[in-house]
Curated annotation (Swiss-Prot):
Residues 1-10 have a biased composition (Basic and acidic residues). This is Embryonic testis differentiation protein homolog B. It comes from Homo sapiens. Residues 1-25 are annotated as: Disordered. It comes from the Eukaryota.
Length: 59
């Protein structure tokens, strides 16, 4: 008796899952305005999306 491959599950090669490249990783937005501003002064710029979330706090 030979083993038969069931018709419902065809044999497919397993998909290779690559680790996401660090350059493609989305950075978590900073939750602390002070940390964001200090990092900006030190040259560690983040996108201004963080600032747009805090407009209500700064005005």
């Amino acid at each position: 008796m030979d083993k038969e491959v069931p018709k419902g599950s065809p044999r497919e090669p397993a998909l290779n899952i690559k680790k996401s490249d660090k350059s493609f990783k989305r950075k978590k937005p900073t939750e602390n305005v002070l940390i964001f501003l200090i990092n900006r002064q030190l040259g560690r710029h983040r996108s201004d999306i963080d600032l747009s979330r805090w407009v209500w706090m700064l005005s």
